[in-house]
């Protein structure tokens, strides 16, 4: 059985990795996310009754950041530039109909446009 401090350190590291993946090249947001993560972990330094819930919350937050956050960017010099999404390998893909299909592999037939 793992101790809460080891689990907390692991959750913190996973959260930092997830912020690095989700906010790559957006240093302002990356710094803000990491600062908030640090603040939350510092507020709950001592082991308490809700420590396992806090660790689970951190792991779930890391999962959401890694699988559901997509950042867009466009060329700031061009006023009519199109937004480009930075979709990485961990992003959960699907369409609205696929949400209703539980536990099945979803085949994407066409690319997003």
Swiss-Prot record:
GO MF entry, a single one: protein folding chaperone
Pfam families xrefs: Complex1_LYR
Which top-level group of life is the source organism from?
Eukaryota
The GO cellular component terms are: mitochondrial matrix
Concerning InterPro entries, the annotation shows: Complex1_LYR_dom, Complex1_LYR_LYRM7, MZM1/LYRM7
Q: Does the keyword Transmembrane apply?
A: no
The family database entries (CDD domains) matched by this protein are listed as:
Complex1_LYR_LYRM7 (cd20267)
User: Does the record's keyword annotation contain Mitochondrion?
Assistant: yes
Intrachain disulfide bonds: none
Which GO terms are recorded in the biological process aspect for this UniProt protein? Answer: mitochondrial respiratory chain complex III assembly
**Keyword terms:** Chaperone, Mitochondrion, Transit peptide
Q: Where in the cell is it found?
A: Mitochondrion matrix
Describe its assembly: Interacts with RIP1.
* Function per UniProt: Assembly factor required for Rieske Fe-S protein RIP1 incorporation into the cytochrome b-c1 (CIII) complex. Functions as a chaperone, binding to this subunit within the mitochondrial matrix and stabilizing it prior to its translocation and insertion into the late CIII dimeric intermediate within the mitochondrial inner membrane. Modulates the mitochondrial matrix zinc pool.
Record's PANTHER family? COMPLEX III ASSEMBLY FACTOR LYRM7
In the record, the note on similarity to other proteins reads: Belongs to the complex I LYR family. MZM1 subfamily.
Please state what the protein is called. Answer: Mitochondrial zinc maintenance protein 1, mitochondrial
Organism for this UniProt entry: Talaromyces stipitatus (strain ATCC 10500 / CBS 375.48 / QM 6759 / NRRL 1006) (Penicillium stipitatum)
